[in-house]
Amino acid sequence: MQKNAYTFEELLACGRGEMFGPGNAQLPAPPMLMFDRIVRIEAEGGKYGKGYVEAEFDIRPDLWFFDCHFIGDPVMPGCLGLDAMWQLVGFFLGWSGGPGRGRALGVGEVKFTGQVTPDIKKVVYKIDLKRVIMRKLVMGIADGVLEADGKVIYETSDLKVGLFTPEQMA
């Protein structure tokens, strides 16, 4: 039986390649791992019934990006929130049994209506899978949002992530 939630320690193990087997999906290691835990993952959940992932990221003023983006005007780069959503789609594909290493393939649309600053306490990512392909091509297509302290500030449509075997990447 698959787990439906993962701790930070388990996410680190995934980053070392210990969760889905050698050559399969891995999360990045910190500081590029952009969430602290997956609080819910479901194969048939979400608004499209194709899968759902929800993860949380505890925001602290000492996070690495606040010191350099920007000096005197600290804000989490929007691309890091977007990357977190790609990370979660890739995790979902590995969790679902897809073979290969994850690669972001694109996004249809991204909309930012707010920012993550050091005074934010928690970011929540919510990913709704729209399509999951598990053939020679392993790919997930999803919509995602980022909530900062309960308010949606990033919205994405058609996040695309594929899993690729070494032969496919050659």
Curated annotation (Swiss-Prot):
Keywords: Cytoplasm, Fatty acid biosynthesis, Fatty acid metabolism, Isomerase, Lipid biosynthesis, Lipid metabolism, Lyase
Organism: Caulobacter vibrioides (strain NA1000 / CB15N)
The reaction(s) this protein catalyses: a (3R)-hydroxyacyl-[ACP] = a (2E)-enoyl-[ACP] + H2O; (3R)-hydroxydecanoyl-[ACP] = (2E)-decenoyl-[ACP] + H2O; (2E)-decenoyl-[ACP] = (3Z)-decenoyl-[ACP]
Pfam families, alphabetized: FabA (PF07977)
GO process terms (BP): unsaturated fatty acid biosynthetic process
Main localization of the protein described in the UniProt heading: cytoplasm
Pathway participation: Lipid metabolism; fatty acid biosynthesis
Name this polypeptide is given: 3-hydroxydecanoyl-[acyl-carrier-protein] dehydratase
Family of this protein: Belongs to the thioester dehydratase family. FabA subfamily.
Catalytic residues in the record: H69
Known function: Necessary for the introduction of cis unsaturation into fatty acids. Catalyzes the dehydration of (3R)-3-hydroxydecanoyl-ACP to E-(2)-decenoyl-ACP and then its isomerization to Z-(3)-decenoyl-ACP. Can catalyze the dehydratase reaction for beta-hydroxyacyl-ACPs with saturated chain lengths up to 16:0, being most active on intermediate chain length.
Molecular function as annotated in GO: (3R)-hydroxyacyl-[acyl-carrier-protein] dehydratase activity; trans-2-decenoyl-acyl-carrier-protein isomerase activity
Keyword Cell division: no
EC number from the UniProt entry: 4.2.1.59, 5.3.3.14
Subunit structure of this chain's protein: Homodimer.
Subcellular location(s) per record: Cytoplasm
GO CC field: cytoplasm
Entries under Gene3D superfamilies matching the protein: Hotdog Thioesterase
